[in-house]
């Protein structure tokens, strides 16, 4: 009972929007490449940049006022819960730097198996360096 009361008080004090005590912080659907018809032109553009952790395929676009992205993790990476964990982490990183991302880009990030051993902070620093080199990240604030 005490924990529930404390949680309600904390939510009220911090003015967090909550639905059934679950914080709503989700990447909006308009920023995600979902359809195959959206993803295949990105791969066919043949503009890519890679390192030991990621490969980013990207294409410039002017039709949308914002960026769109997709994440891809191969089965060699590990079991489903490991693949889902790395995708959740990268989505959180992208969400945190979304105001700084180039709005005229569609990009697909392919995650390699070596990224499995990294912590969240290491993954974030490597991704920010990588995104700055590929000019997907406009300014690192």
From Swiss-Prot:
Q: What role does it play?
A: RNaseP catalyzes the removal of the 5'-leader sequence from pre-tRNA to produce the mature 5'-terminus. It can also cleave other RNA substrates such as 4.5S RNA. The protein component plays an auxiliary but essential role in vivo by binding to the 5'-leader sequence and broadening the substrate specificity of the ribozyme.
What molecular functions are annotated in GO for this chain? Answer: 3'-tRNA processing endoribonuclease activity; ribonuclease P activity; tRNA binding
Tell me what this protein is called: Ribonuclease P protein component
Kindly state which keywords UniProt assigns to this record, in alphabetical order: Endonuclease, Hydrolase, Nuclease, RNA-binding, tRNA processing
Any Pfam family matching the protein: Ribonuclease_P
GO biological process annotations for this chain's record? Answer: tRNA 5'-leader removal
What EC number(s) does this enzyme carry?
3.1.26.5
Q: Which family does it belong to?
A: Belongs to the RnpA family.
Specify the species: Onion yellows phytoplasma (strain OY-M)
**GO cellular component terms?**
ribonuclease P complex
Reaction it catalyzes: Endonucleolytic cleavage of RNA, removing 5'-extranucleotides from tRNA precursor
Q: Which InterPro entries match?
A: Ribosomal_Su5_D2-typ_SF, Ribsml_uS5_D2-typ_fold_subgr, RNase_P, RNase_P_CS
State the oligomer form and interacting partners. Consists of a catalytic RNA component (M1 or rnpB) and a protein subunit.
